[in-house]
Each structure stands twice: as C-alpha cells, then as structure tokens.
C-alpha cells in the first residue's frame, strides 16, 4: 500500500513546494527567535508570581505547576490566533495568483485533475503552518509537563490547532478560486469572510443574551445559548471549553445542573469546521472544473 508521504510528493505541486521551501530554515529560525523572545517574558512573569506567592498573599496559584500552566495556556491561545490569521493569507493567492499570472489555464490542461490541484495547493499552504506549529510545539509540551496538564487537554489543543489550520486554509483557498487577483482575494478574505467567522460568534452570544434576558429565561438556557454561540470561534470555543472542564465537568459533556448536561463547544467546533473544510474544498474543485470546461 502506498504511503501517504509518497502520495503527497507524487503531486507535482506539493513536490515543487517542498523543493522550494527547503530553504525554510530562515523561517524556522525566525519563529524560534520569536519564541525565545517570548520565553523570558513568561519566565519573568512566572518569577514575579512566584515572588508574590512567597509573600503569603493568599493567591490561588501553585508555584511550579502554575508556571507550567502559565506557559501552556497562553502559548496555545497565541498559536491558535496566529494559525487563524495566517492560514488564509498563505492560501489566498494559491489559485488567484495563477489567474493573475495567466498560468492557471496551463495548469488546468495538464493531466492533473482538479481535486489534485486543490489538494496540492492546500498542502503547499499548510507547509508554513506546519513549520510554525512545529517550532512552538516543544514550548507547549514543556508547559504541559511542568504544569501537569491533563493529556485530554493536550489532545483537544492539538485537534483545535489541526482543524483550525485546515479550515481557515480552506477558506483562503475557496476565496482564491473565486477571485481574479490576489488583491481581490485578500480583501474579500480579511474584509468579509474572516470577520464573519470570527466576529459572528460574539454577535451571536450578544444576541442570545439580549433575547433570553428579554423573555426572562433562566441561567441554564442562557448557558446553553452562550455555549452554542461560542462553538464557532476558535478562541471562544477553547476558552469556554476550558472553563467548563475546570468547573469539574468532563471534556465531552459538562454538567450544568444535576442531571442536565451540555455538549462542549470544542466538539461542536470540530464538527462544524470539519464540514466547512470539506464543503469549501469541494466547491473549490467544482470551480476549477467549471473553469476547465469554459
């Protein structure tokens, strides 16, 4: 059976991306230096917290474990933000750039089917994201080990990062397939599409609060509404899931009241964005097939 690596590198678009980005040591070094600059900040803040703890100020933080968690959670959230913002821009010129350079027609008349072109462009865009995640991941692992973070939390963080990278790269790729120039694709992605995905959940949470407060609904219904609205933004899904887990609930279902459970936002997030990824990639393939028929 052919390995995944051989299937990927057999795609000429992916092979070309790997060949040109082997010089990516400069990129890796840049991210590594950025994280080195970030580490002293965390360590300094951790030392400050440890000093405060030694003064018996009754702060609710442990020393070494709190320092590890102080590294793990902010670093994971920052990486999630970086992936969310950088993923579309790495894919937004994938197809629009070919149209702008008038090389897309040459690509379409090759023996590569449309789905192989889209897959190759997707993997090419994910290479840089893979570099970024790989550079930061050791710091996250150190924070998880020192902070005694549960394995299920590390698993959820990994799934959130992976699905976010795929979904938001697919968003950029879909917009790129519908645009004629890189400028148009970038403006459409960061001016309309991305705000709809990122700001929409906050507006949904605000709307849920106003509606349920107006009809005098109880806290349980409000919690259900907030949890569901928070499930469509990577940051709110991660934070609300952590808060629910920290309150003593499981990582699949959280108990709001005795015998009443609510599904964790991260599960809804994964399901929704996995579907969005499949849908947008399918639409991008259809778009290329339509252009090939013209």
Annotate each predicted stretch with a short phrase.
Residues 71-97, 101:
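Long, hydrophobic alpha-helical segments
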Residues 37-41, 128, 132, 136, ...:
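Alpha-helical transmembrane segments of multipass membrane proteins
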Residues 123-182, 188:
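Secretory targeting signals
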């Amino acid at each position: 059976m052919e390995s995944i690596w051989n299937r990927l590198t057999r795609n000429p678009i992916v092979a070309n991306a790997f060949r040109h980005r082997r010089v990516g040591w400069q990129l890796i070094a840049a991210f590594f230096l950025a994280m080195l600059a970030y580490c002293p900040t965390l360590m300094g803040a951790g030392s400050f917290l440890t000093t405060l703890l030694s003064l018996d100020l009754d702060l609710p933080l442990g020393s070494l474990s709190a320092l590890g968690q102080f590294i793990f959670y902010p670093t994971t959230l920052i990486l999630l933000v970086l992936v969310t913002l950088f993923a579309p821009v790495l894919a937004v010129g994938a197809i629009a750039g070919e149209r702008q350079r008038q090389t897309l027609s040459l690509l379409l008349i090759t023996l590569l089917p449309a789905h192989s072109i889209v897959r190759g462009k997707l993997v090419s865009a994910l290479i840089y994201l893979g570099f970024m995640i790989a550079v930061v991941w050791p710091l996250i692992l150190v924070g998880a080990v020192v902070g005694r973070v549960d394995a299920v939390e590390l698993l959820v963080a990994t799934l959130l990062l992976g699905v976010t990278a795929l979904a938001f790269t697919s968003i950029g790729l879909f917009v790129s397939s519908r645009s004629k120039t890189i400028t148009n694709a970038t403006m459409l992605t960061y001016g309309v599409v991305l705000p709809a995905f990122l700001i929409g959940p906050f507006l949904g949470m605000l709307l849920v609060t106003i509606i349920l407060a107006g009809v005098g609904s109880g806290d349980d219904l409000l919690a259900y509404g907030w949890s569901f609205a928070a499930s469509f933004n990577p940051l709110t899904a991660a934070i609300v899931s952590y808060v629910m887990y920290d309150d003593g609930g499981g990582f699949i279902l959280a108990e709001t009241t005795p015998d009443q459970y609510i599904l964790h936002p991260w599960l809804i997030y994964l399901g929704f964005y996995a579907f969005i990824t499949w849908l947008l990639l399918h639409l991008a393939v259809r778009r290329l097939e339509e252009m090939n028929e013209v």
